[in-house]
């Protein structure tokens, strides 16, 4: 199981390509670790070093020393199924380079080009392929038809997402979102990259209305087991 949090998906993928991956079981010791507590302590280390006006090298040394104590020393190699990998080789075997593509649909940039997506979580300036909204929906549907998941980043307004039912719906008066409606929502900040989920399939109700099935990260104690 792989879990990445923070910023957007492509920022995390770039970190994987740059630094590699190490399975949790590759670390020495079998005692469970409280990841939340480790994160809080790491933040305290950073704040202390900032207060000391320490150099980046001093901060990295202090943080690495703490992480070695909390997690164990960083493994230089990964051993899995009788094969030895470096962290970068292991990452490439799990997430091959260019195995994901990012798409957006905005009219203030030209279509069919890589553009900078101006969204709060894209502070690493990742580029997205800008396509018309109909093309974007076709890409999503074609990937699902090929049994591939799609990472969705967007917002879940309280008046559109009913947690008790596990369903998100637009106003019933809106039969179809067109390019102009989407652009207005983006420019008015009524939609933005507040949350991310994996779209894994499609479904329909007895009236023929189409729904996209998305896996959430809020646990299994919600409708449809998450």
Question: Residue ranges of each PLM-predicted region?
Answer:
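Papain-like cysteine protease catalytic cores
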Residues: 1-84
């Amino acid at each position: 199981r792989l879990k990445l949090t923070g910023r957007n998906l492509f920022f995390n993928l770039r970190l994987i390509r740059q630094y590699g991956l190490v399975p949790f079981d590759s670390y020495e010791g079998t005692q469970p670790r409280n990841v939340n507590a480790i994160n809080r302590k790491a933040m305290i280390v950073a704040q202390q070093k900032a207060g000391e006006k320490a150099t980046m090298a001093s901060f990295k040394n202090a943080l690495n020393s703490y992480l070695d104590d909390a997690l164990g020393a960083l493994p230089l190699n990964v051993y899995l199924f009788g094969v030895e990998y470096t962290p970068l080789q292991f990452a490439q075997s799990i997430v091959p380079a260019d195995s994901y593509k990012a798409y957006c649909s905005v009219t203030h940039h030209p279509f069919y080009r890589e553009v900078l997506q101006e969204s709060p979580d894209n502070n690493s300036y990742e580029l997205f392929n800008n396509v018309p909204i109909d093309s974007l929906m076709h890409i999503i549907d074609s990937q699902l038809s090929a049994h591939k998941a799609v990472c969705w980043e967007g917002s879940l307004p309280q008046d559109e997402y009913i947690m008790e039912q596990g369903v998100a719906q637009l106003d019933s008066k809106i039969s179809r979102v067109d390019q102009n409606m989407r652009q207005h929502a983006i420019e008015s900040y009524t939609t933005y990259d507040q949350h991310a989920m994996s779209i894994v399939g499609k479904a329909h109700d007895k009236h023929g209305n189409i729904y996209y099935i998305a896996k959430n990260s809020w646990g299994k104690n919600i409708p449809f087991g998450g």
